[in-house]
């Protein structure tokens, strides 16, 4: 499994990349492979304030549905609207098709997440 090293990861298979004062969040290639062809990405509430680990949205495939979790405490500030019409963008390129952006309550929380090697150890 080849993972980008320019971002952090969660044990629940989200990737997180700092972009200015917000974090961009998506699901890992491993997660999209397990789910299969995605048919829906959504239920992300822009403006919602979440704690790390709380449900931020959902991804659904023909065979399963899975929650997407907030990687850090913060406020959801954007949803990738392109995914409403074309959720398969995640299947095509999991590391460029972001799902939501979160403004962290504490930017240092990024350092608490897994690096690529740590995620690889968890994900197998």
From Swiss-Prot:
This is Glycine cleavage system H protein. The glycine cleavage system is composed of four proteins: P, T, L and H. Keywords: Lipoyl. Belongs to the GcvH family. GO terms for biological process: glycine decarboxylation via glycine cleavage system. CDD domains: GCS_H (cd06848). It comes from Bordetella pertussis (strain Tohama I / ATCC BAA-589 / NCTC 13251). Gene3D superfamilies: 2.40.50.100. Residues 22-103 form the Lipoyl-binding domain. PROSITE patterns: BIOTINYL_LIPOYL, LIPOYL. The modification N6-lipoyllysine is found at residue 63. Binds 1 lipoyl cofactor covalently. It comes from the Bacteria. The glycine cleavage system catalyzes the degradation of glycine. The H protein shuttles the methylamine group of glycine from the P protein to the T protein. Coiled coil: none annotated.
């Amino acid at each position: 499994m080849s993972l980008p090293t320019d971002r952090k990861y969660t044990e629940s298979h989200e990737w997180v990349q700092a972009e200015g004062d917000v974090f961009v969040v998506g699901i890992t290639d491993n997660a999209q492979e397990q789910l299969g062809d995605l048919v829906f990405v959504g239920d992300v509430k822009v403006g919602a304030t979440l704690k790390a680990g709380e449900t931020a949205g959902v991804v659904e495939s023909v065979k399963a549905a899975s929650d997407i979790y907030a990687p850090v405490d913060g406020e959801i500030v954007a949803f990738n609207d392109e995914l409403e019409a074309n959720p398969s963008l995640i299947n095509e390129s999991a590391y460029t098709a972001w799902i939501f952006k979160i403004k962290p309550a504490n930017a240092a929380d990024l350092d608490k997440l897994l690096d690529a090697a740590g995620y690889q150890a968890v994900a197998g």
